[in-house]
Amino acid sequence: MTGVQTCALPIFKELASKVESGGKPVIEDQAFREKLAACEIELKALELTQLRVVADEGKHGKGKPNPASSVLKIKGSEIQQTTTELLMEVIGPFAAPYDVHGDDGSNEAMEWTAQIAPSYFNNRKVSIYGGSNEIQRNIIAKAVLGL
């Protein structure tokens, strides 16, 4: 789950250094950099948690799932959604590159942006499929907290 996001973040940084918003590259926006840094930190924490879960795999009863897998699912889906949100923020108005009646053509979109918005909306489902994040939290509450 972390591989795609790990590969995508450097690409997002490069795009953010090329795409301008308000006359300056998006990467120079302090709020954007803070969101990007938070996403990178969350991604690194998820990678380390995955390694711990794999290392501890033999400690759980045979056939019993590790409750930490629910944590991985929740955090992984949240990070996946965050990365697509960051990409949407980078491309800004280019997210809708289609000609609109009366458009003077001044908003020339980059060709690749046509797939970004559909991908963003498609990725909203990741917190639902495979068991919603709320269900995963209930699993954690029962297995770990005994609630």
Features from the language model and the residues they span:
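Single conserved hydrophobic/aromatic residue that forms the stacking wall/gate
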Residues: 1-7
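Alpha-helical interface subdomain recognition
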Residues: 8-147
